[in-house]
Amino acid sequence: METYTGIPEELKFAVLERIQPTEPEREKLFAIQEELASQVKIAAEKLGIPGVLVKMVGSAARGTWLSGTHDIDVFISFPEETSRKDLETLGMAIAREVARYAEHAEDRHAEHPYLNITYKGFDVDLVPCFRVASASQIKSAVDRTPFHNDFVKPRIKGHEDEVLLLKQFMRGGGVYGSELKTQGFSGYLTELLVIRYGSFKNTIYAACSWKPGEKIDIMQHGEIEHEEPLVVIDPTDPRRNVAAALSLDKFCTFIDHCREFLKNPELSFFFPAPILPLEDSEILEKLESRKSTQLAVVFKTPDVVEDVLFPQLYKMEQAVAALLKEYDFTVIKTGVWSGNTETAVMMELISGTLPNVKKHIGPPVWVKVHAEKFKEKYQAADGVFGGYIENGKYIFEILRKYPTARGLLEDRLMSCSLGKQVHQSVNEGFEIIENAGICRLKEYDFRIYLRKWI
Amino acid sequence: METYTGIPEELKFAVLERIQPTEPEREKLFAIQEELASQVKIAAEKLGIPGVLVKMVGSAARGTWLSGTHDIDVFISFPEETSRKDLETLGMAIAREVARYAEHAEDRHAEHPYLNITYKGFDVDLVPCFRVASASQIKSAVDRTPFHNDFVKPRIKGHEDEVLLLKQFMRGGGVYGSELKTQGFSGYLTELLVIRYGSFKNTIYAACSWKPGEKIDIMQHGEIEHEEPLVVIDPTDPRRNVAAALSLDKFCTFIDHCREFLKNPELSFFFPAPILPLEDSEILEKLESRKSTQLAVVFKTPDVVEDVLFPQLYKMEQAVAALLKEYDFTVIKTGVWSGNTETAVMMELISGTLPNVKKHIGPPVWVKVHAEKFKEKYQAADGVFGGYIENGKYIFEILRKYPTARGLLEDRLMSCSLGKQVHQSVNEGFEIIENAGICRLKEYDFRIYLRKWI
């Protein structure tokens, strides 16, 4: 077992100095929250909509936001008996009324529509919700949020800095954010970890020994089994795993980040040095030293939000890897990158070419009907090099249909099961670039991605 | 299910015409057997060795030899109570006395020494054995043979032609011969099949539906379980499987040969067209069309009999394939060929080269002690391209030690577990030839082997 050196207080101060909201920042945020709350009330009155309450939720409301983030979540709460239709139309009417004073407004859609506005420089979500009796009786996913707020706020009081440290530490490790692109830790999850373990430090120490199946149930009320690597039962809903979005690899990356940090507690675990984009010459050097085959399937970035796009890209990544494996190519790794205009599914292969001859293994000779059918089929087929018996099975050496990965993808990519928007975009056209060809992709962010890739 | 067309009588006649010993051939063989028998008796008397009997065994004694084969087995039978030492010295003394009239004599050794002589153009084995009460009480493996003779001779009478047909059919299919090179059917096994099934035709029909584990127990006295694909309990020894030497692939090759024959009963199944040696130009053509990598490990043929050599070659074939797989090369197939001067272990690979980068998969991150050790080791190692977490496991991209199969074999072949004589020979020197390099091997028999190989 490692013996860890502990976390110096000076380090924590140095981090907090950079992430704690300043007093003027706090005052401004609170003032804006007040303003928005009264705007909602005024709008409801003006539109003659009764029973509306305003709830400030999220990290802004709980004092756990990182300095520099300007997100405010305003929940417009309707009586439980309101119909879905009324919730949507009346809720959005109020939101739009508030938006009259905003610099910018945009309709968004989760389970229900909501309005995202820019208000005095803040990024504000105006979200209609039902006011239900408990989080286990919610009518819409967003109804849960006010309960989270009620649970966390009193318990986190005095520990806000610990949450800030943990959030920034997770950012530094690339595991902060529960959106479907990142599949990491949500803000609420971070708060629950601090409530459970008492501090940033204790969370880090505990995580070093986490295993998949790790379970945290603060209220001791979990009702069902969960399959995810980390199970944190929602204190406001015994059936929900707050860490359901956390992938196994992000779970492990966090464990690794904690262990490395405790071995050598440094500022860089919170604020890693920026990654420099890879130059053409570096790409060529790396290709030459690895001598593997790099392949990228490049297509126009579909015009959808990341939470829709990335699950489709991850699905495509799996499908492409499966296709390559099915046709005998050995995949070293796969990845996805998506920029403003172009998106790439990346693959590294042992080799992009295979021999023309393919060993096709048939059924055992003694499984008579199958074996005879198999033999008849291949004996008479075109391009058969030869046949023999090995380990009791018929083997035919047949002509490989796709001796190059490029040819395979060009011909069969569209037969992969792809998500709707990705399918559309790929169907409009895609390009397969290989090895030095990837120098064609110049986007700064792609070149940063490449430095991690090769 | 196939419906077979039956076996035309004319076909059988046509085959028998070529393999049935002619009357003069039979007379001559019988005369020579008589001569040898009396030679043995005279020798025993002359040397003053009492209790010696002569037993003519083998196909010559049972009338089931193929025309043109001139093998005679003369067993010199001693009383059971004879010591091993006496059996060997007295038995060989008698044999040597007989050998005085031979054109050529050569000491050979199975479990005991015996003498192989050429006598009036016949290939004769003079084999000392114990005269035991039953085959289950044998003192030496050869003691069993006279019992085989006693069992087969009366039962095969009148069916000798059926045995001849089956033997020749197996020859045509490359499955006749129980020596360790061939791992096929022995003559005795062929006779037992005809006794069991009644005829050549019935044997062929039955074999079409054989499965591994097929059991034939004519005397219904089998005592132990056998693992081999075909189990034919020795009628003279309930513990012995007569088909123990038959490999799974030869078992299957025979099944296949039977099925194909019944689909299209032709003379070529008994007398296949000779295989022509592959010319250099054909080798190059085939390499170009297959585009795989051919490798041959070539060394001086060890000076031992095939029954010693081939098990060692098969073992080497396995060991080399395992070595290549261990280092990530994909083996399509392996084979061995052995000529008078040179021997080659053949391998066909997807590719003889691999990238420099090798994906090294470590333990899951949560298996703390192992995972941390693994990470520490590779993080600090030379030639590491990078590391990441995938499916919960640490992955390091390390520098591949052997990016070519040739380099691997040159460096590590001697670390393979090799048989004694093969080890000696390989240790004295070996050559690795690749692709067009195999044109260097000119032996006629190798070029015939090559035509089957590629």
UniProtKB/Swiss-Prot annotation, chains A, B:
Reported function: Catalyzes the addition and repair of the essential 3'-terminal CCA sequence in tRNAs without using a nucleic acid template. Adds these three nucleotides in the order of C, C, and A to the tRNA nucleotide-73, using CTP and ATP as substrates and producing inorganic pyrophosphate. tRNA 3'-terminal CCA addition is required both for tRNA processing and repair. Also involved in tRNA surveillance by mediating tandem CCA addition to generate a CCACCA at the 3' terminus of unstable tRNAs. While stable tRNAs receive only 3'-terminal CCA, unstable tRNAs are marked with CCACCA and rapidly degraded.
EC number(s) reported in the record: 2.7.7.72
CDD domains: NT_2-5OAS_ClassI-CCAase
Encoding gene, per UniProt annotation: cca
A Gene Ontology BP annotation from the UniProt entry: tRNA 3'-terminal CCA addition
Family: Belongs to the tRNA nucleotidyltransferase/poly(A) polymerase family. Archaeal CCA-adding enzyme subfamily.
Assembly and binders: Homodimer.
Cross-referenced Gene3D superfamilies: Archaeal tRNA CCA-adding enzyme catalytic domain, Beta Polymerase, domain 2, CCA tRNA nucleotidyltransferase, domain 2, Poly(A) polymerase predicted RNA binding domain
Domain of life: Archaea
Positions annotated to bind Mg(2+): 71, 73, 125
Residues the entry annotates as binding CTP: 59, 62, 148, 167, 176
Known catalytic reactions: a tRNA precursor + 2 CTP + ATP = a tRNA with a 3' CCA end + 3 diphosphate; a tRNA with a 3' CCA end + 2 CTP + ATP = a tRNA with a 3' CCACCA end + 3 diphosphate
HAMAP family hit by this protein: CCA_arch
Binding residue positions for ATP: 59, 62, 148, 167, 176
Keywords: ATP-binding, Magnesium, Metal-binding, Nucleotide-binding, Nucleotidyltransferase, RNA repair, RNA-binding, Transferase, tRNA processing
Note: A single active site specifically recognizes both ATP and CTP and is responsible for their addition.
Cofactor(s) essential for the protein: Mg(2+)
Pfam families the record matches: CAA_C (PF21133), NTP_transf_2 (PF01909), tRNA_NucTransf2 (PF09249)
Listed name of the protein: CCA-adding enzyme
Source taxonomy: Archaea, Methanobacteriati, Methanobacteriota, Stenosarchaea group, Methanomicrobia
GO MF term list: ATP binding; CCA tRNA nucleotidyltransferase activity; magnesium ion binding; tRNA binding
Enzyme class: transferase
